Amino acid sequence: MKKGCVLLAVIISLGVLPGCSSRAPELSEIYDRVVELVEASYELNEIFYGDGLPYYGRNLEIYAPMYSDYTTEGYTRDYNIVSDLAKYHSVDEIKMAAERVYSQALLEEVVYPSAFTGLLISGAASGTQYVNARYVESEDDFYIYAGEDQTLTSPTPLIYDYATMEIVRPSNGERVLLRMTAWEEDAPDSPTTVKLTLTLSEDGVWLLDSLTV
C-alpha cells in the first residue's frame, strides 16, 4: 500500500495522470496571442475575400502593353496583373503570411482551394457554379481575378471586443474554443456573440482554426 502511494505521488509530480496534459490554458496565457492573430487576420481576409491585392488597370494606357503578352492559359480574360506596389508578389508569399495566422488544416480545406485552385459550388437554385481561383501565377507574372462574377466577397469586417473574451467548453491544451462580442464595422450598435477556435500547431504555436469573417 505504501509503495502504491509513493508511485502515485511520483506520477502526480511528473504530471502524467490522464488528462493532465490536455488542460485548457488560462485566458491570460493566450489573450495577447488571440489579439495578435485576430488583428493580423484582417489583412489576410482582405486578400482572400475582400478587394484583394492592388493590380494594374487595363484601362490605363501606360499598363496596356503588359496585357498584350498574357501567357496565363485559360485565365487571361478576367485576370489582372498584381501591382509591383503590392505587399505580396507570389502565391508562396501569401501562404507564408497566412500560415502564421491560420491553421494548416483550415487553409488547405477552406481557404486555399478558392484562393489558388478554383472550386465547384453546388446550389439547389443555381446548380453547379465554378469559382475561379483568386490568384494564379504564370512564369514571372502574378495575377488576381477581377471578373464580375467574383462571388467570394467578404462581408463588412467584424470588430472584436477583446474585453469580452472567454474560454468555453469543450477546450483543452491543444484546442481552445473562445467566445466574445463582435459587431460589423458599420454597425457598432448591433453587437453579436461569435466563437473562434484556436489550435496548437506541431511547433507549439497557437493559430486560428476558424475564420474571423
List the predicted regions and their residue ranges.
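C-terminal motif of bacterial Sec signal peptides marking the signal peptidase cleavage site
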Residues: 16-19
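Mature, Sec-exported extracytoplasmic domains of Gram-positive
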Residues: 23-213
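Hydrophobic membrane-targeting and insertion signals
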Residues: 5, 21-23
